[in-house]
Design a protein with these regions (language model features):
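Multi-pass membrane glycosyltransferase architecture that uses lipid-linked
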Residues: 2-283, 330-467
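Transmembrane-lumen/periplasm boundary regions of multi-pass, lipid-linked membrane glycan transferases
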Residues: 262-293, 297-313
Length: 467
């Protein structure tokens, strides 16, 4: 069964692209949100026999229902453009120092960061506003936004696949098509969250960083790193790991990286600083004040210990995520950044490449590129494991990198990553209330996912340096 299906979609690269495009643009992007979803749900569940077609597709509509984050993006764009907003976003963030979005719909443009407080750095802003320029309601906005994220992911997929194919010693005839097809399967495992959040942009920028490192384009490596730092802050920590993995040494090369990074940061953060001088400190303060996320490593361990001791503690919604309250959780949250830096340091140490002597031949291209890609994956995993906040959409960052590994190693890496994202999709869309309320199924599921992430991290570290 699976053999003919695989051959059908990997005969040519274009067939694989068409499959992955269908998954991302259509299949993951077809459901409803807000009041439209509620009406569909109530109508179908009340009389399934009267709506057989809706009853048949209900499981998929439920699985891919629109996310509250998309409603928040819609309200943000509406506030900036002065357009009406029919969705209520007042409860999405929970307790938060950010004021509620005012959407008077008076047609007056408002200056982002100065008149509309935002938690999204400037590189994300065009992706939030553009779909609102093209639509008049949340339903169509969500479809356009999802298609935009799908386009970014498809581009990242093709870039990653070509990195792996071009560095392989003897690539198979359909190697690129197989990688792109596998990326579509990873999207299916990850679910609609891959196109319902802004993290597709981070995924694209990270794979562009890796491509620049592979090609030895130091200024571009720095530029993409600066831009990803301006987009999401923490992923810029992948840069020092890539510098060591790709053997960037010497003042001239490091200077080119620094210059490119400065340009990327200025272009990415400059609009925020110009439009609202207090916006950057506000965003940094906002994220530093967030509590210990229930899905983070420390959050999972803390919640598990409390549950085992018979004193399970429910989280509360604040700053847009479910976090543990209390002094112990607060202390663990403060330890998250040092822990993250330590994990990245371990990956950096394992990633360092030995300098090539003049009398030696050039290093094997397959091994060199594999080291760079695995280093990027391992550093990204370190950010997940060490972070105070670990939302499932962060897993999107690694999807294009998984298919960028040369040879056939990408298959095993993609499989384990696929298990991680599949578990995440199951609990997020199936029983997330069990997670944030710390009920048994939720606690056990989080331990299972943390274990899978540990296996994934060890697999990558062993490939870097077989201790």
């Amino acid at each position: 069964m699976w053999g003919p299906l695989l051959r059908a979609f990997t005969t040519t690269t274009w067939r694989a692209v068409a499959f992955t495009a269908f998954v991302s643009f259509v299949w993951l992007n077809h459901s409803l949100g807000g009041k439209d979803w509620e009406a569909f749900r109530d109508r179908t569940l009340a009389a399934p026999a009267s709506h057989p077609f809706d009853a048949a597709r209900y499981p998929f509509m439920f699985l891919y229902r629109r996310a509250p984050d998309e409603a928040l993006y819609y309200a943000t764009a509406s506030a900036i453009l002065g357009k009406p907003c029919e969705v209520d976003t007042s409860a999405i963030r929970g307790d938060s120092p950010l004021p509620p979005l005012a959407t008077p719909g008076d047609g007056r443009l408002r200056v982002p960061y100065a008149e509309v407080p935002l938690e999204y750095p400037p590189p994300n802003l065009p992706l939030v506003v553009l779909p609102r320029l093209l639509t008049s309601a949340f339903a169509t906005y969500a479809y356009v936004f999802g298609a935009l994220m799908a386009a970014l992911l498809l581009a990242a997929c093709v870039i990653g696949a070509r990195i792996g194919v071009r560095a392989s010693r003897s690539p198979r005839e359909r190697d690129e098509a197989e990688r792109i097809f596998a990326f579509g399967l990873l999207l299916l495992a990850h679910g609609a969250i891959s196109i319902q959040r802004l993290d597709a942009l981070v995924a694209l920028l990270l794979v562009l960083m890796v491509r620049a490192a592979v090609r030895g384009e130091d200024a571009r490596l720095g530029f993409w790193a600066g831009l990803v730092g301006a987009t999401k802050f923490v992923p810029i920590l992948v840069l020092p790991v890539l510098l060591l993995a790709s053997g960037v040494r010497g003042g001239k090369r490091l200077g080119a990286v620094a210059l490119g990074g400065a340009v990327g940061l200025v272009l990415g953060l400059g609009p925020m600083i110009v439009l609202g001088q207090e916006s950057l400190p506000m965003i940094l303060s906002y994220h530093s004040a967030r509590g210990l996320h229930v899905e983070s490593t420390f959050g999972v361990l803390y919640g598990t210990v409390k549950w085992v001791l018979g004193n399970a503690e429910a989280t509360r919604l604040d700053y847009g995520s479910f976090n543990f309250p209390g002094p112990v959780a607060g202390l663990l949250g403060k330890l998250a950044m040092p822990f993250t830096l330590a994990l990245v340091g371990v990956v950096a140490y394992a990633s360092r490449s030995a300098p090539v002597r003049r009398e030696e031949s050039q290093p094997d291209e397959d091994a060199r590129v594999a080291r760079i890609v695995v280093a990027a994956l391992a550093a990204t995993t370190a950010l997940w494991l060490g972070g105070k906040v670990f939302s499932p959409q962060y897993l999107t960052w690694a999807l294009p990198l998984a298919v960028a590994l040369p040879g056939r190693a990408w298959i095993r890496v993609s499989f384990v990553l696929g298990l991680v994202v599949l578990v995440s999709q199951i609990y997020l869309r199936g029983y997330y209330d069990h997670v944030y309320n710390q009920w048994p199924a939720g606690v056990i599921t989080m331990v299972v996912r943390l274990g899978l992430l540990g296996v994934f991290s060890r697999m990558l570290l062993v490939r870097l340096r077989p201790w």
